[in-house]
Amino acid sequence: MRSASEDRTAIARIRDAAIEQWGRHGFNVGLRSVAEAAGVSAALVIHHFGSKEGLRKACDDHIAELVRESKTESMRSADPANWLAQVAEIEDYAPMMAYLVRSMQSGTDLAKSFWQRMIDNAEQYIEEGVEAGILKPSRDPKARARYLSMINGGGFLLYLQMHENPTDLRAVLRDYGEDMMLPALEMFTNGLMTDSTMYDAFLAQREQGIPFSHPSEGEGNDGSNSTVPAAD
C-alpha cells in the first residue's frame, strides 16, 4: 500500500511532468506520455486526477497559485534585492511560461477560466502593492488588473514569436528580462504622457455613459460604411 507521502510525491511528479510535456509539445500529448515522463503508470494518473481534463485543471491551479505567491511576495517587499533576485531566476520559469503560452493559444473554455483566475489574482496582488505603498491606487482596480494582465500576456506572446529561437524558452525569458524590464519600469514609474488631458477627456465621456466606439451620424450597425474591404 502506498503511503500518503508517496501519493503526494507522485501527484507532484505527474503534475510537473504534465506541465513540461504540454508546455513543450501542446495539449494533444496524451496521458500515457505524461505518465511515462513522470515514471508512473497511466492508471496511477487516472487514479489521482480522474481524466486528462482533471490533470490539466490541477496544472492550472498549481501555476495560478505559484504566480500569485510570487507576485504577492514582490508586492509586499520594498527591498530591491528581492526584486533583483526574482529576475535573476527568470529562466527557472521556462516550463511554466511554455505552459502559459500553450494555454493562451488553445482558446478553450478551460483556458479562458484559467486566465480569468489569473486576472482576478492580479487584482488581489496589485492591491497588496497599493496597501504596501509601492503602487498607486486606481479609480478602477479591476479594469487596471485586466489591462495589465492582457498586455503582459499578449506582449510576451508577441515577443516569443519575434525571438530568433522561440523554442528555447529559457533563452526567450532571459532576453525578455533584459529587453523589457527597464522600458516597462520607466513607463510605469514616470508615465508616458506629459499631462492628463487625454485621460480627462475619455474619463468625462465614460462618466456621461457615452461609448468610446459608436456609429457616426448616418451610419448603421451593419458595417456598410466600413473602410475595411469586404471579402470576395
Identify the role of each PLM range.
Residues D120, Q124, E128-E131, L157-D232:
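C-terminal peripheral helix-coil segments that are non-catalytic and often amphipathic
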Residues R13, A17, Q21-G54, A58, ...:
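Helix-turn-helix
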Residues R2-R13:
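Short, Lys/Arg-enriched anionic-surface-contact patches
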Residues V87-E123, L160-E164:
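Amphipathic alpha-helical segments used for helix-helix packing
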Residues A58, E65-R102, S106, P141, ...:
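Hydrophobic alpha-helical connector segments
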Residues R13, P95, Y99, R117, ...:
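Amphipathic alpha-helical interaction segments
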Residues V67-K71, T108-I134, A143-R146:
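Amphipathic alpha-helical packing segments from all-alpha helical-bundle domains
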Residues S149, G154-L158:
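Outer-membrane beta-barrel translocator/channel fold
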